[in-house]
Amino acid sequence: MAHKKGQGSTQNNRDSAGRRLGVKKFGGEFVRAGNIIIRQRGTKVHPGSNVGMGTDHTIFALIDGIVKFERKDKERKKVSIYPAS
């Protein structure tokens, strides 16, 4: 019985692909209606004026304009779109 014991493969050597979250359009950038501004998990940033929020909390532009990041209150942030004049 001069056999080697079978070499077991490791079970924990896996990782999932990144979800590509984060800010897609930054403050001062021009966006068109429908452009995604932020992809996020939960409401890290809340929608302001002229901005919509998808079912997965994605924030997107409702009008063409300039992106502006603002404070909603002491701890919450919001993003708004103002028409380019």
UniProtKB/Swiss-Prot annotation:
HAMAP family: Ribosomal_bL27. GO terms for molecular function: structural constituent of ribosome. Residues 1-21 are annotated as: Disordered. The keyword Ribonucleoprotein applies. GO terms for cellular component: cytosolic large ribosomal subunit. Belongs to the bacterial ribosomal protein bL27 family. One of its GO terms (biological process) is translation. This is Large ribosomal subunit protein bL27. Pfam families: Ribosomal_L27. InterPro entries: Ribosomal_bL27 (IPR001684), Ribosomal_bL27_CS (IPR018261). Keywords: Ribonucleoprotein, Ribosomal protein.
